[in-house]
């Protein structure tokens, strides 16, 4: 049985994909710059990797700048450290942008683990919820 699903009932990942796919394909085919905030919001890890790899293989005269909270893309096999940046917010005093290659990671190092351990900055700081706050 084929029943169309209304857009609003699609998953967040499917909605996000359907929103960005036209611009994504247009930039690949026509060239230009694609800016995407929350690129992989709702995507399966395999889909976000596939899209980045596809863009890098097919886009001749195009660039993509995207923001993602997913660490899945911090793989040596997907992006190089000179293509990865972190943004660290300075408690109301602006932000600091750091290129991962500034730490000169070796090709055998696990970039995702380095990021999660705080080497590149950009990690959010969460305070413990105390009993007094309740």
Residue ranges and their predicted role:
Residues 34-37:
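Catalytic Walker B motif of ABC-type/P-loop ATPase nucleotide-binding domains
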Residues 44-49:
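Short alpha-helix of the ABC ATPase nucleotide-binding domain corresponding to the H-loop/switch region
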Residues 1-25, 39-43:
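Conserved ABC ATPase signature
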Residues 50-134:
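C-terminal lobe/lid and adjacent interdomain/linker elements of RecA-like ASCE P-loop ATPase modules
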Residues 16-17, 32, 63:
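Conserved active-site beta-strand-loop modules that form the wall/rim of enzyme catalytic pockets
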Residues 1, 30, 62:
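Polyanion-binding interface signature
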Residues 24-32:
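Short basic/glycine-enriched coil/helix segment immediately N-terminal to the Walker B
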């Amino acid at each position: 049985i084929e029943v169309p699903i209304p857009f609003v009932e699609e998953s967040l990942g499917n909605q996000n994909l359907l929103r960005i796919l036209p611009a994504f394909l247009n930039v690949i085919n026509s060239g230009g710059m694609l800016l995407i905030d929350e690129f992989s919001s709702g995507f399966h890890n395999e889909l976000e990797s596939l899209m980045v790899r596809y863009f890098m293989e097919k886009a001749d005269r195009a660039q993509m700048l995207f923001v993602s909270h997913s660490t899945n893309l911090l793989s040596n096999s997907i992006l190089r450290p000179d293509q990865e940046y972190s943004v660290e917010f300075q408690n109301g005093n602006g932000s600091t942008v750091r290129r991962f290659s500034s730490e000169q990671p070796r090709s055998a190092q696990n970039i995702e683990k380095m990021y999660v351990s705080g080497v590149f900055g950009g990690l959010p700081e969460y305070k413990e919820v105390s009993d007094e706050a309740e």
